Amino acid sequence: MRLLWLLATVVALTSAGILKDAPKKRYENFRVYKLTIQNEFQLAVIEKIAELSEKYNIWKDYDEHTKQLDIMVSPEELKHFQNLIMFNNIGSELMIENVQERIDEEQVTATADDATFGWTKYYELEEIEAWLDQIVDAYPTVTEKFIVGESYEGRTIQGIKISHKTGNPGIFIESNIHAREWITSASATWFINQLLTSQDAEVRNLAESYDWHIVPVFNVDGFVHSHEKDRMWRKTRQPHATNACIGADANRNFNSHWLENNGASSNPCSETFAGDTPESEPEAKALAEYLTTNKEKFNVYISFHSYGQYLLSPYGHTKEEFPENYADILTIGKAFADAIEGLPYGTVYQYGSTADVLYVASGSSVDWVFNELDKKIGYTIEYRDKGRYGFILPPVQIIPNCEELMVGMRALIEKTKELGYL
């Protein structure tokens, strides 16, 4: 009982802000390895050490097709980790030698050009929200802000609607549900800007033929924490009464096959913790309520993530079943991937159901929209790269990534319309 009381006290103090003055977490000499897993025992060994110790962090879950996963290792555990993988005959490739160096490189030095919002650096929440205000002021006849709801820490979850005419079919984009995936909100704001300012005929047609509902930063609390305290933070920020670990994976917290088939974790310290109950996180509950209320306003749902270069579709909770319209879903996915691969960058995207192409993930927003709101076209876009930088994608890659997004989205929407879903 005393242990439970102490844990609850720590959580309460943290929630009250007493412990929030802790210094920003540094990742000096933390390494990221890509491991090649040959059997279930090896996988269990790696997943167990990651779940039991905060000195390990799985960046990219096990992919059954490549037989690989990415894991970050603290310098204190490095020798033990190297012995462990050698003893268990697990293949490894060093992807990042010093995570903190990558983080430091990501922080672009301010220049005179930074007086205006752009896409050569990553921005904090207040800067993104201020830019949204400027956009609405600059384009009052075709834009309006909307509020999805409120986060645990009391921040508003803001979005922008772009609409050129009444009666357009709608597309909803949710971004940065995982806090550390900064490329997602950067891509969302770039996409908004292009819809409003581009003079390209195909982009103008895309902008004016559909209503766009875009939430650049969904996990607002986690996003702020990732900027101010811990660059590698993923989850929400709601504490738990009986555990010192904070937050849940909001993308495992939706009430669609919640916690099924090991597609999430019941451990509050896990990065894929599903929450205490479905929609236990205020953010997930708010989005579910908002989308339910406004379900007639959109036909397609897209969720921005990183990393790995995938276009993932339902189902996430099982690879034994597929949606009735899976052939159409794959046709659209191929159009997206082919369009991106046709660019000079040569970036390759895999496409298919989450569970089949990548891993089982239950309780995701895309699956919830598909199953509960009957929206039959929904995708998770996992942006660059394949692991060389992972979540810490250099700012110089923001615009190339966004260019891939635009050609991919144009192809995706065109094929979706051709097949009769828009």
Language-model-derived ranges and their functions:
Residues 2-7, 12-422:
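M14 metallocarboxypeptidase catalytic domain recognition
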